[in-house]
Amino acid sequence: IAQCLVGSEMCIRDRCSSYVLEYLSNYFDITVFYYNPNIFPESEYTKRILEQQMLIGEMKGKHPISFVAGNYDREKFYELAKGLEHLKEGGERCFKCYALRLEETARMAKEAEFDYFTTTLTISPMKNAEKLNTIGAKIGEKYGVKYLQSDFKKKNGYKRSIELSNEFGLYRQDYCGCEFSVRDRKQESTGIKKK
């Protein structure tokens, strides 16, 4: 993998995954594309974007890491979630949300002539890497930009992300980001079951 990827440029759809940046910056010039219209409330969105920018400013990789913020298109997220609000995290609503964000990343990668695009979401034990990779590959074909398949949580990737978060003093959220995951977390913490 290193031989064919060195020196390439990559666009990453990110939510502050330190390990992914540490690892991929050995092989790519990286642009972190922060596109997360699902995040709720707006103060949480702002908090996460500032954390991402701080990390990029402090983290030194073998190759450059830059940052681009996408639009905070909350209405797009609510359009895709319509009728799926009742579903728990990890279901069809999430898959549509992955596709929305990966589609925007691929569009941006195509427009800026990146060699690859990927997502950091596979670092999370709560995310289905196989589903993310299937969605990413399909969108990559549509846009003519290679999708870098991954499961960053493996080979101690998730463990390393926690170590780096502690090292850099990063904020680690306890929910995915959307209003519905906030609701689910509150219900779990109070023991209330959804009907």
What does each of the following model-derived ranges do?
Residues 1-7:
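Single conserved hydrophobic/aromatic residue that forms the stacking wall/gate
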Residues 8-9, 13-195:
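Nucleotide-activated chemistry modules centered on ATP-dependent adenylation/adenylyltransferase
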